[in-house]
Amino acid sequence: MKYKNMNITIDVTSKCNLRCKHCRVNEIRYDMTLDEIEKVFNKLTDFKPRGVFISGGEPLIRDDIVEIVKKSKKLSPVTILNTNSLLLTENKLKELIDAGLDYIQVSVDGLEEQHDYIRGKGTYRKTIEKMKMINKYSNQIKLHISSVVSKSNIDYMEKFVKEILEIEKINVQILGFKRFIPNNVLKDVETLGKNGLKKLYQNLEVLQKRYKEKTIITSDMPMKNIFNEKQAIEIMKKYNLDCVGCSAGVNGISIRNDGTVTPCTLLYISCGNILKQNLKEILQNADMIKIKKRELKGKCGKCKYKKICGGCRAAAYQILGDFLEEDLECFI
């Protein structure tokens, strides 16, 4: 099985300065030391990761975040920092740029009212100011925005895009929308459902065409490949992949802050611990193999598009308790 050119997400801490309602952050209180993170990166070298996402918690909480970025850049050509941005100072930004950081991905979950509902009162305006600061160095580092779409903000997607792109001193290279994955806190009130997920896809189609001259609007939803089958197959061939769509355990893995390896940041099943095992051994874990071979159940298992879509394994796990089950929100 082919495992090179994966994207690696590593949670360098579970600590955070916010308490967002939809947060996936775990209760693991042990954070790897810098030496342990270096050990992890050394174990990943042979797999030649396409990109490394440094995440958390809030990674800027760590005093050694600049050193982590430096070590990441030795491993992969692309390093992305996932952050809420509120702890970012201009001096720290300069240090991160000097360390080789390629992208800063800032979380913004809709207009001010929706964002503050999720992340806390006053956080939207503070985040906007931080993005203006980042943009001062736009010739040295790229700004991404990551936005989680749920029931409370799906009707404001275009208004949000328009507002963000019209703010002076902010140049967004990529604006990525992510579907809300149910959790115990907001499962019943924010889950999109079939109609909501269909609306998300339709909104994306409109926004991508309408704002293509201003920014790149993307989404990680697997079902989009069904409507772009030819392109999906070309990507499989280009990167020598067994399948595309849901990237969990296929062309991406997640490493938690204690070294636990999971197929995805939102799929909380342990497949091993990279501090105690080598990655090749972990990738041969039975659960990883089942996902990679698309040994799916229900509607997803019978679907002719499972090699280019596969549904969302995290959604199946959160809703049905089985990561191989069908994605109940599929609108196809």
What are these regions (language model features)?
Residues 15, 19, 23-26, 249, ...:
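Cys/His-rich metal-chelating microdomains
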Residues 26, 55, 107, 175-178, ...:
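Conserved residues at the C-terminal ends of beta-strands
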Residues 4, 48, 139-141, 246-247, ...:
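Residue-level preference for beta-strand/loop junctions
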Residues 11, 32, 78, 98-99, ...:
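Radical SAM enzyme [4Fe-4S]-AdoMet core and its adjacent flexible, acidic
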Residues 1-103:
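Conserved alpha-helical substructure of the radical SAM core
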Residues 19, 48-49, 100, 139, ...:
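Short loop/turn motifs at secondary-structure junctions
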Residues 243, 260-261, 265-332:
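Flexible mid-to-C-terminal extensions adjoining Fe-S/redox cofactors in radical SAM and related proteins
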Residues 6, 50, 249, 265, ...:
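Exposed loop/turn and edge beta-strand positions of beta-sandwich/beta-sheet ligand-binding modules
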